[in-house]
């Protein structure tokens, strides 16, 4: 039996079904999502918290938590440059796959990123494909928050799009239909990020078997 994978790719993610009925919720958008980290060296994570995915939120007390097996690491966020932006310097102490969660400090509006590989200094892991990178960006850029169960944004489950149209839309979002509940914010995506998201959204990765 086939089922759509946008609901199962991201274990531990707080789905918007709760948030959309909780009164106040935020979308976390990571600025530059790293492909990997170097164990023992600080990696900078910055993000913007937007209330209802639109308005930047100021004066939050956020933090970042990372887990790999029995190992844990954490960092306190500080205000960054620009409205609603926060920065944290996180050090992953040992090589391995680390699950990183950004606690926004705005209610339960947190996001758990897909695992990040920490490698030994001097080691370069295999480069991510556009589809792999796009899958990570779909979470890290906050797309999954609004689209994963179609409660807020359109359900993208199993759909395919013209690549040129989709790339143009991601670069300059606009309201698709007058009945849409809200307009997608412009996330300032880089061309490489747009290409990766287009590759992921149009891939077979969205479909898996039980």
Feature-to-residue mapping (PLM):
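Short amphipathic beta-strand segments in non-cytosolic proteins
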Residues: 51, 62-77
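Beta-strand-rich domain onsets/edges
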Residues: 20-44, 125-126
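Extracytoplasmic electron-transfer domains, predominantly the class I c-type cytochrome c fold
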Residues: 145, 152-208
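Residue-level recognition of secondary-structure-to-loop junctions
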Residues: 80, 86, 90-94
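Electrostatic cytochrome c docking/interface patches
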Residues: 37, 119-139
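Edge beta-strands of extracellular beta-sandwich domains
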Residues: 109-118
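Short, aromatic- and glycine-rich surface loops/edge beta-strands on solvent-exposed regions
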Residues: 97-105
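Beta-strand-rich structural segments
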Residues: 28, 40-55, 88
